[in-house]
Amino acid sequence: PTPGESRIIAGETIDGALARTLPGIFPHIGLGISKRFENSVIYNISAMGRNKGLPTMCRPDQAYAALFGSVAEGTAKQEFAARNNLLDFLRDDIKRTESQLAGEERAQFGAYLESFETLRNRQSRLNEIQHTLREKGPVPSDKYSSPVETDRLDAQFDLGAAALICGLTNVLTLSSAAGIQDFDITFKGLGLNIDKHSIGHGKSYEDKTWSDLYNIIRRYHFDLIAGLMKKLEAVKEGDGTMLDNTVIVYLSDGAEGHHSRCWEWPMVVIGDMGGRLKSGRYIDYPGYGQKQHRTTANLYVTLLNLAGASRDSFGMADPALKDFDQHGPLNELLA
């Protein structure tokens, strides 16, 4: 890694914490794109806890096989069947080995067996909802294996929407820049032949300033989010729609600067959770270290409380803010 980068997983991320609170067939699904087309899975976006990274699947064709392989045709179906056979073999092999062990080694193999049982049970649950997956699952297209980054991100949003609608997960993370050294996407599909890192350093392209370029990229992302919202809005759930019971958080690609300290970090929170969140407003908290200043952790506590978790803190407290109460939700967001 280059200076300033870290491969250390110090603790849980907010999506990992929510995954424990809102478990599903897949507690968490991470989908994204990376600079290098050959990157299949990245582990630098999400985590369930210290040194427990969560995968971000960066190839839509492979993500489709993992999520919808039980009802797929061709290669994806073959991969799903092969995965089941492999899990069955490994589970039985671990059981045989475990029976020959004692003490700490037996306990360790018991943990391995539990992991494989979890994976196999997940595959079984996918088989149980095949009708739903066939009815509401996505239809793969050339975008799923396209070398064009915008095609792949479009496909990942399609997969993510289908995963939510089919009940595969309650927690979805979509990333358009996955990988410690592979975040530097060039959005050629938007007609831009300049990478995001160069844009961040203020470079222009053709007749467009760095600000113009960022606006084009961000507008594209919001169009994708709007498409996701429309799909959720079309699904009835309870007395409303899936969108009524969903919160979407758009995290900006940058804080107060290209090489930032994250003292300011703009976010967009979409959805009101059935009226439990106050929406349609712009909120600007006082600057870092000032009276009534709040941290990103306070927003995350807000989300966890909405999900039903009894938490009043998240992550590590900022030692430079020792005189501030860093606990609790953002009351300004709660109805």
Where in this protein do the model-derived segments appear?
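Ligand-binding pockets and gating/stacking loops
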Residues: 1-335
